[in-house]
Amino acid sequence: MFSGIIDQLGRVQAVAEEGSARRLTLGMGYRDLALGESVAVNGVCLTVVSHDALGCADFFVSSETLVRSNLSALAVGAHVNLERSVSLATRLSGHLVQGHVDGKARLLSVEDEGQARRVTLSLPGELHPYCVEKGSIALNGVSLTLNAVDAGQADGRFAVAITLIPHTWSHTNLQHCAVGDEVNVEVDVLAKYVERLCHAYLTPSNA
């Protein structure tokens, strides 16, 4: 479990194909990683499979994760958002993030709003029920607040708007995203549980 507060930016050191999967080698500032530890990479929960004293670690990325996330597009030198898992003693400054990506959003625009930036993105239509104004969403693992959610577009997708404060912009890889790029999306897990419970108990057979 994570909180959506990015610890640091890492860099991709190597990408190796392993059948339909991949092994990512990331350079990071962590010096006390343990084998089997969970680290969120661009919001995707990955397991440390090896590491060294210089701060590099290897992660195995399954074919399912490659299809569902933007980790498939990573090349050597790319910046990635990193967050270590929370503990019971951790301050929950963001919101509960599982590291289970629901899909990818496409960046539509970035507009300056004083020192902040307003970012508009297009999301898959199936995620619309879980997105509400002033609700939480994780983009590339960053806990953010939805400022606006539209009713949907003709292509079956829908648009959302968020505001990035200067600190978030400068401390995450969202600063490196360009219009048309894809970012990982994880909607609020609480919204998914509520939707499932409502569907189970409010269908006509249970009404």
Question: What is each of the regions a protein language model found here?
Answer:
Residues 1-207:
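Conserved loop->alpha-helix
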